[in-house]
């Protein structure tokens, strides 16, 4: 799993444990997700390409470094992926935002797209796809396949928790897409929930059932 990166920073692991607790309030869960996504953004953007530019400081001219290429795009898999956006925008405030809506067909159990809205000129952009849970991996694989049609420069997938089944599915479909997660949990249950997990991330973010 050389293309899977578990972010084991102590603050990430501490906040993730607080989020897992069943007695964490909606407010606490949402706040912790924002803090976690900010911390994870530093790791995910670690290898972004740089270019040299000439600037003037108050004292002299120097060569500085800035991010190379077009603006980064954060793509949320609706609806839970939206919980990642504010925290990541703390680190990359100039990023563009895209959304993909998918639901699971009850007969085939395969993802079906119902919404797709992206910034213009996606070719050669770097994309970070965000979804708190990588469970079966089917939605993630479908989202990445759809985004590849736009010919971006790179795609990364970021989640809070991953199941081994989801990691295997996404890696098999897209071995070129690195996965960043705070933890890889034990397994999926019969209903497709990650164990031990943290429950339904969307419901816990938005206070719904």
UniProtKB/Swiss-Prot annotation:
Cofactor note: Binds 1 Mg(2+) ion per subunit. The magnesium is bound as Mg-PRPP.
An annotated GO BP: UMP salvage
EC code(s) of this entry: 2.4.2.9
Activity control: Allosterically activated by GTP.
SUPFAM superfamilies found in the cross-reference section: PRTase-like
Gene3D superfamilies: 3.40.50.2020
CDD domains registered for this protein in UniProt: PRTases_typeI (cd06223)
Record has Magnesium as a keyword: yes
Record: residues binding 5-phospho-alpha-D-ribose 1-diphosphate: 79, 104, 131-139, 200
Enzyme class: transferase
The protein's required cofactors: Mg(2+)
Pathway(s) per entry: Pyrimidine metabolism; UMP biosynthesis via salvage pathway; UMP from uracil: step 1/1
Function text: Catalyzes the conversion of uracil and 5-phospho-alpha-D-ribose 1-diphosphate (PRPP) to UMP and diphosphate.
Family: Belongs to the UPRTase family.
Name this polypeptide is given: Uracil phosphoribosyltransferase
Gene assigned in the entry: upp
